[in-house]
Amino acid sequence: MFLCLFSAPVLNVLSRANAQRQAFTWRSYIPLLLLLTVLTAALTWLYLSLSDEFTETLVSRGEVLTEPRIFLVQCSEDYENHKRFPGCTPTKCGRAVTDSVVTKEEAQILKRLAERGLALGGSDGGASILDLHSGALSMGKKFVNIYRYFSNQISEVFTEEDFKLYRDVRGRIQKVIAETFGLDSSQMYLTKPTFFSRINSTGAKTTHDEYWHPHIDKVTYGSFDYTSLLYLTDYGVDFGGGRFVFMDSNSNRTVEPRAGRVSFFSSGSENLHRVEKVVWGTRYAITVSFTCDPDHGIADPTLP
């Protein structure tokens, strides 16, 4: 009986107005819905990247690789933003692991070298570095030059044999990288930073202690074209956590450190990675980095 108060034209106008209001209301939510979709996708990616439930072990500590185990990936465009060097700039990208370049005994000698150097300083947080090239040594919340700060003690801390082994190992790592990626090793140059690292479970005191963040070496350092890690201690024996994690789009892929193990990879976005937080014990390693640009090359260290 109430509908008879309105004529048909009036009802049509009211219906159209109501429909327009509803359409406007839904359209106003579209940007919010799109934002929520993007945020959900980003959070899902982050969860998958950081969750151990979606992790594949590339190489376990218990395996012994007498030949490099190679995993090829498509090269990123990062290298296009830098000058190209034929025979060196990555055209074949990937990651590889081998246990046949450095012996366990040599790794133990290098670990003792690092222990002696780091005993003179050390970070207040969980991550300390020693760079034999620049002399940089973590001390408290800052860095000092070990060669200047401890000039009277250097001969008691390092020996020429230590440095000779360090140079020899660097050469062997450079050779296996060149062979694996089909490079001219004479066109590869050691670059900075190249350093020893010591990581334990102590909480971070400065940003320098926050080693666990995902990053891309080519983006972070610019000069890097190939990155290598020489592990000096054993995962699950000397420390817990601290695995090296390649963060691929569909899964995490980890390398479990083993004393004497060398892991190496092209340094671009194709190898986004992080290191798990060390939860107990102490993890020692050497980062040995290479560039194709001679202007960014550094010399082997020499004992002062």
Describe each model-derived feature in a short phrase.
Residues F2-V262, S269-P304:
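Fe(II)/2-oxoglutarate oxygenase catalytic core
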